Amino acid sequence: MARPFFRRRKSCPFAAKDAPKIDYKDVRLLQGFVSERGKIVPSRITAVSAKKQRELARAIKRARHIGLLPFIVK
């Protein structure tokens, strides 16, 4: 009998060898990890590892500070 509430764990999208580098200038990549309201999406939803989530948050905040990403979306 299969486990009824068992979900397979997603792997980190930045763990592969050919995965994209997290860079604050890569706005297209960063927008995938920001909600419609401009908030950073938590790692339990995006399945990003803790280390890469910190790098991602730092890159998003840096991009916001220099004006590449908005702080809030109306």
From Swiss-Prot:
Keyword NAD found: no
Any single GO CC term annotated in Swiss-Prot or TrEMBL for this entry: cytosolic small ribosomal subunit
SUPFAM superfamilies for the chain: Ribosomal protein S18
Pfam entry (one): Ribosomal_S18
Alphabetical keyword list: Ribonucleoprotein, Ribosomal protein, RNA-binding, rRNA-binding
Keyword Ribonucleoprotein: yes
Molecular function per GO: small ribosomal subunit rRNA binding; structural constituent of ribosome
Any one Gene Ontology BP term: translation
Database matches in InterPro entries: Ribosomal_bS18, Ribosomal_bS18_CS, Ribosomal_bS18_sf
Oligomeric form and interacting partners: Part of the 30S ribosomal subunit. Forms a tight heterodimer with protein bS6.
NCBIfam families, per database record: S18
Function: Binds as a heterodimer with protein bS6 to the central domain of the 16S rRNA, where it helps stabilize the platform of the 30S subunit.
HAMAP family from the UniProt entry: Ribosomal_bS18
Entry's family note: Belongs to the bacterial ribosomal protein bS18 family.
Protein's recorded name: Small ribosomal subunit protein bS18
Gene: rpsR
